[in-house]
C-alpha cells in the first residue's frame, strides 16, 4: 500500500507545483493539461514496473467470481460518482453558455487540485479503519475513526479556507489579458470550494461503508444525492447561472454527508453522530473566524504574483494558528493518538 500512496502523493504534488509554474511562466490551458496528463501517465507505468519486479502472477488461474459478488452495487456507486462529477459542466453546457463553462472549468482546476492533494494525503489511512471493522474491535475502530475524522477536518478546513481566500485572485492572475468573459467571480469561487469541502469531510464514513462491504445499503443515497444535484441545478441555472449549479452540488453533498454520518452510527456500536458534528462545528467556527480575519485585515486587491505569494503565506499562518489552537483546546486525545500512530 505504501508504494501506491507514496506514488500518488508525489504525482499530485508535482502536478500542483508544475501547474503553478506553468501559470506564472506560460499560462495556457493546453500546456496545463499536457503537464497533468504526462504526470498521471507515469503512475500506471511505475505500478507496472514495481509489480513485475516484486510479484509473480499466474494469469492462467481460473477467476473466482464470488470475490466480487457486490460488483454491480459497486458499479452503481461509481455511476453515481460519475453523475456527481459531471453534473455541473453538463447542466451549464446545455442550459447556459460556453463562456460560463469556461469560468467553471478554470475555477474547478484549482479546487480539484486541492482535492487531489487531500485524497493523496488520506489514502493510507482508510485501510486501518477497515481492519478494525473486520476484527469487530469497536474500541479500536472508534479511536481510528476519531483520528481519521480529525485529520480530515484539519486538512480540509486549513487547505480549503486558504483556497477560498486565494482562488479568485489566482484565477484573475491566470486569466489576465483574457476579456471574453468576466472571470472575477468571488461568490462562485467560495461556494465551489465549500462544495468540495463537504464532499471530503464525509470520507471517513464513506470509506468505512466501503470497507464494511455495504455497497448495497449506500447505493440509493448515492442516487438521491445525484438526483438532488441535477434537479436543483437545472431549476436554478437559468436564474443564478454558476451559483445555481453550485447550490445544487452543496445540497446534494450535504444530504450525502448527513446520511453517511447517520449510517456509521448504525453499524458501529457506541458511535454517536454528535462526535462528528462537534468537530464540524468547532472547525467551521475557527475557519470562519480565520476567513473573516484575513479578509478584513489583509484583503488581496491589487493582484500580482508577489502579492499573491505574500498573502498566501499570511493566510496560511493565520488559519493554521487558529486550527492549532482549536486542536490544543479540544482535541488533545486525537493529537496524542495521531502522534503515537506516526511513531509506529
Regions found by a protein language model. Name each.
Residues 294-344:
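Membrane-proximal transmembrane or re-entrant/amphipathic helices at the cytosolic face
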Residues 29, 66-74, 92-112, 140, ...:
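Interfacial/gating helices of multi-pass transporter permease domains
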